[in-house]
Curated annotation (Swiss-Prot):
Organism the protein comes from: Vanderwaltozyma polyspora (strain ATCC 22028 / DSM 70294 / BCRC 21397 / CBS 2163 / NBRC 10782 / NRRL Y-8283 / UCD 57-17) (Kluyveromyces polysporus)
Alphabetical UniProt keywords: Cytoplasmic vesicle, Endoplasmic reticulum, Glycoprotein, Golgi apparatus, Membrane, Sugar transport, Transmembrane, Transmembrane helix, Transport
Bilayer topology annotation: Multi-pass membrane protein
Main localization (coarse): Golgi
Name the record gives this protein: GDP-mannose transporter 2
All ranges on the Cytoplasmic side of the membrane: 1-12, 69-84, 130-131, 196-211, 270-274, 322-332
Keyword Phosphoprotein set for record: no
Upper taxonomic lineage: Eukaryota, Fungi, Dikarya, Ascomycota, Saccharomycotina
Length: 332
């Protein structure tokens, strides 16, 4: 049995979709901003190590809370681990591609392009769960795509101008600028696969929030450590500049932030649906994007403003469409 130990009167809000959505919004803002702080240095090349530290902090925090009696979740066993391992592989792919995206893209552009994940998930739910996509939803998807194209245009121009000042006008910028879009595209598909498989596996295993959180992170540890050992430079010259006291402190803080996002992700998927979970993230992009303007690499131009507003509008349209579909199904 996995549970947050609360009183009888508090059980109502623990199972409330609106409370889960608000908690997910707050934790996703915290996670995005803390990861951007860590990844803002383009020379940072220890992504797997960063993700390993985040997952390790999350696992240690959970175990400490369990010992203190604040939370309860299933003990580790081989059967559950074997059933959940494919989800952990998807999680590693999702968080790695997310960290690489944040390394090359500004927070506003990153959050806008994450909208495209919703389209992939929506059609994934058609295949996996027999849901349908209506005309209003298609309209919101079209707005998401348009907002992403506008954001990409404004960000490209801003990035080229910034790189010209840094590297000189004679350097080719196409690879440097476009690599971020490759990583965000990979992240969209990895995120969709993770959410869809997790929802299906939760139905099979009857995992609760802390079970999901514990197994997601503990099974990721060997994968992340192996990835760091195989693909990252562990020489003293490379390791010391990236793992000094300031960077290590920020990594630990981002690990604590990952505790919140790990729990709230599983919580939100359990009490709502995987598409609603992703749509909330899309609606949440407005405060995330505005917060992202605190960073110097975020483009402040008309394209950025238009893309954010269009993306936000697409979220509202989608939410209305889902509400109408729910009301129609209740009438039948």
């Amino acid at each position: 049995m996995s549970s947050l130990k609360v009183s009888q009167q508090d059980k109502k809000w623990v199972n409330s979709g609106s409370v889960a959505i608000l908690a997910y919004c707050a934790s996703s803002i915290l996670m995005t901003i803390t990861n951007k702080v860590v990844m803002s240095d383009r020379t940072f090349n220890m992504n797997f190590l960063l993700l390993f530290i985040q997952s390790l902090v999350c696992v240690i925090t959970l175990l400490v809370l369990k010992v203190l009696g604040s939370v309860n979740f299933r003990s580790f066993n081989k059967t559950d681990a074997r059933n959940w391992f494919p989800i952990s592989i998807c999680l590693v792919l999702m968080i790695f591609t997310s960290s690489k995206s944040l390394q090359y893209l500004s927070v506003p552009v990153y959050t806008i392009f994450k909208n495209l994940t919703i389209i992939v998930i929506a059609y994934g739910e058609v295949l996996f769960f027999g849901s349908s996509v209506g005309n209003m939803e298609l309209g919101s998807f079209a707005l998401m795509i348009v907002s992403s194209l506008i954001a990409a245009h404004g960000d490209y121009l801003h990035s080229v101008e910034r790189l010209k000042k840094m590297l000189g006008p004679n350097v080719s910028f196409s690879f440097i600028v476009n690599i971020g879009y490759f990583w965000i595209a990979a992240n969209c598909f990895a995120s969709a696969l993770f959410v869809l498989l997790m929802r299906k596996r939760i139905q099979v295993t009857n995992f609760k929030d802390f079970d999901t959180m514990f197994y997601n992170n503990v099974l990721s540890l060997p994968l992340l450590l192996l990835g760091s050992y195989l693909f990252e430079d562990w020489s003293q010259e490379n390791l010391l500049p990236h793992v000094d006291i300031d960077n290590l402190s920020t990594m630990i803080i981002s690990g604590l932030a990952s505790v919140a996002i790990s729990y709230c992700s599983g919580w939100c998927v359990r009490v709502t649906s995987s598409t609603t979970y992703s749509m909330v993230g899309a609606l949440n992009k407005l405060p995330i994007a505005l917060t992202g303007f605190l960073f110097n690499d975020a483009a402040r131009n008309l394209s950025s403003a238009a893309s954010i507003l269009l993306g936000f509008a697409s979220g509202i349209i989608y939410a209305v469409a889902k509400q109408k579909k729910l009301q129609n199904s209740e009438k039948i």
